[in-house]
């Protein structure tokens, strides 16, 4: 490449690359700065409200709180959010996926018994008796914000906390369903939640300073 062409290429890269960084990515995104965003969420158990720019899911009784979005056609997905266990929490918080009812779903949770736990509830019957399947040790703290990420593809799920791989699990009993958040005897604060995947509608997400996820990452990481 001669010098003139090299300079031209460098100028093009300098002009285009910043535009790529600042253009919107596409995902279903909630920053919870607008109280109207609460109307998208279906609360199956517990209480869900938007307070000070965060979605608060609360059920401190000895039972679960679940809030979901989506429909029964959703399959594979990437879910990200910032999540905090608030004061008064006694047990766990996390994600649910492929949910058809409040007794039919998969769940991954960050637990106050110092572990990350995966399980599933199939028509009211808990897998593994409700105990976490192959739990991973984790030093869970109240009032500490964590960045959670769940990647679901086919029968496979993989979970990250603050970018650290916390394990992989497989199960073939549930193929589709809604996604959401869940607590058990806890209060969970959620911010900057985004989700994408095949068939999931999109809203513009600014890729600067946001958790913009791309469906292509699933294929790229394989």
Per-region residue spans from a language model:
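Short tryptophan-centered beta-strand motifs in secreted/extracellular beta-sheet-rich domains
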Residues: 32, 79-81, 141-161
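Extracellular carbohydrate-recognition regions
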Residues: 24-45, 204-220
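Bacterial N-terminal signal peptides
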Residues: 10-22
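Extracellular beta-strand elements of beta-rich domains used
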Residues: 32, 191-195
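Secretory/extracellular carbohydrate-interaction modules
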Residues: 59-126
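Short, aromatic/His-centered strand-loop micro-motif at the edge of beta-sheets
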Residues: 124-149
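Short, solvent-exposed beta-strand-to-loop segments that form ligand-recognition rims
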Residues: 160-182
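Extracellular glycan-recognition surfaces and repeat-rich motifs
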Residues: 34-66
């Amino acid at each position: 490449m001669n010098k003139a062409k090299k300079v031209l290429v460098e100028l093009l890269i300098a002009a285009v690359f910043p535009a790529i960084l600042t253009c919107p990515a596409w995902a279903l995104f909630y920053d919870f700065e607008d109280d109207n965003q609460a109307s998208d969420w279906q609360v199956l158990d517990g209480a869900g409200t938007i307070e000070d720019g965060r979605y608060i899911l609360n059920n401190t009784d000895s039972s679960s709180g679940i809030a979901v979005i989506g429909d029964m056609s959703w399959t594979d997905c990437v879910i990200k959010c910032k999540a905090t266990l608030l004061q008064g929490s006694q047990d766990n918080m996390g994600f649910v996926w492929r949910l058809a009812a409040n007794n039919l779903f998969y769940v991954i949770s960050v637990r106050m018994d110092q572990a990350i736990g995966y399980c599933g509830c199939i028509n009211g019957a808990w897998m593994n008796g409700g105990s976490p399947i192959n739990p991973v040790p984790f030093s869970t703290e109240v009032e500490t914000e964590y960045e959670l990420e769940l990647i679901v593809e086919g029968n496979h799920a993989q979970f990250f906390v603050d970018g650290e791989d916390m394990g992989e699990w497989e199960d073939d009993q549930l193929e589709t369903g809604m996604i959401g958040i869940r607590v058990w005897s806890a209060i969970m604060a959620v911010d900057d939640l985004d989700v994408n995947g095949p068939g999931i509608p999109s809203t513009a997400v600014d890729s600067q300073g946001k958790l913009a996820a791309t469906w292509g990452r699933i294929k790229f990481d394989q």
